[in-house]
C-alpha cells in the first residue's frame, strides 16, 4: 500500500521511492545519484567485476527526462535518478552505492486528515516513530484525536510558519504533505524544511509537478494518479501478473510475473532468452528464496520474475514468461 511504501522511503533515508515485490523480499529503491557515489564514472560491468558480492542491479536511469534501461556498458552519472533492484536485506548497501545518506528519523509530521494520512499515521506509529497530525478542520481534528490517541493532533494551517515553528522541527523529523491539495502539500513541506525538518515527502496529483520537486528540496513524492495507474495496469495485464509499479518521471514499468511451466522462458537462461534491449530482469523469487540474477540464471516454472521495461517492450517480454 502507499502508506507502507512511505514507511519504506523514510527508512531508506534519501530514497525518492521504495517499492516492494515478492511479498516484500525484493525491493526497488530509487534516488538521485550523489556526485561522490561509488557507482559513478565506470561502466556497470566493470563495477560488478570489482565487487565480490553483487546483490543488486541498476534497472534504469532517468537523465534529463530520458529513461535509460541499464546494461553492462551503462555509466551512471551524478544527478541521475537511479532505480535499483535488490533483496530486502541489502537495501542499505544499494542506497549507499548511489550515494544516499541514511537519516535517523524519529518523528513524522503528517499534514492532512485524509484516509492516506490516517493509514500513514498508523504505519509510522507501528514503525516506532512519534506522530504529529496537522489539519485545519476542527471536527476532523476531534475525530483524529479519538482515532489516534498516541498521536499529537494539531488543529491549524499546515502551511503556517507559526504552526511549524511551534513544533521545534529538526533533522530527525520527516514532514509529509498528505492533504488533497498539491499546492498545500508542497508549500507545507517547504515551510517545514525551512524550519529545520530533515526530510519532506509530498503527495501530488499533477504529474507536471514532478520535475520541480528535487529543485525545491522535497525529497520524495507519492502520486495519487500513479497509484491508481498501477492498480489499473495490474488489472489490464492480468494473467500471471502479481504486481505492476509505475514511477513519477518515467513511463517504464516494473512488473512481477509468475513463470508458467508451458512458457517459452521456462528452463532457459536469461541470456538465451534474448530479451529486448529495453528490458532488465532485476530479481527472482523461487520457493521462498530471493536473489538478483545474472545472464546464466535459468528460469524455472513458478518463479516470480520482476522485470523493468519500457512500454514498447512490455507485451513481448511478458509473453515469454506466460503460457
Model-derived features: positions:
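Cytosolic regulatory regions of ion transport systems
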Residues: 1-323
Amino acid at each position: 500500500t502507499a502508506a507502507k511504501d512511505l514507511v519504506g522511503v523514510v527508512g531508506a533515508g534519501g530514497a525518492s521511492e521504495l517499492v516492494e515485490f515478492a511479498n516484500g523480499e525484493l525491493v526497488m529503491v530509487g534516488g538521485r545519484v550523489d556526485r561522490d557515489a561509488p557507482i559513478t564514472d565506470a561502466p556497470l560491468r566493470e563495477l560488478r567485476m570489482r565487487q565480490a558480492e553483487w546483490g543488486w542491479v541498476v534497472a534504469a536511469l532517468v537523465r534529463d527526462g530520458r529513461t535509460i534501461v541499464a546494461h553492462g556498458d551503462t555509466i551512471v552519472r551524478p544527478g541521475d535518478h537511479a532505480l535499483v533492484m535488490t533483496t530486502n536485506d541489502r537495501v542499505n548497501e544499494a542506497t549507499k552505492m548511489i550515494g544516499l545518506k541514511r537519516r535517523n528519523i524519529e518523528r513524522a509530521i503528517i499534514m492532512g486528515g485524509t484516509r492516506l494520512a490516517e493509514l500513514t499515521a498508523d504505519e509510522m506509529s507501528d514503525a516506532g516513530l512519534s506522530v504529529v497530525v496537522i489539519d485545519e478542520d476542527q471536527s476532523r481534528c476531534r475525530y483524529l484525536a479519538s482515532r489516534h490517541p498516541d498521536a499529537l493532533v494539531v488543529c491549524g494551517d499546515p502551511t503556517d510558519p507559526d504552526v511549524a515553528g511551534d513544533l521545534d522541527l529538526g533533522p530527525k523529523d520527516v514532514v509529509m504533505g498528505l492533504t488533497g491539495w498539491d499546492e498545500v502539500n508542497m508549500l507545507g513541506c517547504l515551510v517545514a524544511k525551512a524550519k529545520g525538518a530533515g526530510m519532506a515527502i509530498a503527495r501530488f496529483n499533477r504529474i507536471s509537478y514532478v520535475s520541480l520537486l528535487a529543485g525545491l528540496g522535497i525529497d520524495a513524492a507519492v502520486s495519487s494518479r500513479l497509484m491508481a495507474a498501477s492498480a489499473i495496469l495490474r488489472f489490464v495485464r492480468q494473467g500471471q501478473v502479481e504486481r505492476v509499479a509505475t514511477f513519477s518521471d518515467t513511463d517504464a514499468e516494473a512488473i512481477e510475473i509468475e513463470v508458467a511451466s508451458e512458457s517459452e522462458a521456462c528452463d532457459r537462461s536469461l541470456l538465451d532468452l534474448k530479451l529486448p534491449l529495453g528490458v532488465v530482469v532485476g530479481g527472482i523469487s523461487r520457493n521462498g528464496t530471493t536473489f538478483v540474477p545474472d545472464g546464466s540464471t535459468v528460469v524455472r516454472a513458478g518463479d516470480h520474475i520482476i522485470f523493468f521495461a519500457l512500454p514498447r517492450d512490455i507485451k513481448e517480454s511478458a509473453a515469454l514468461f506466460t503460457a
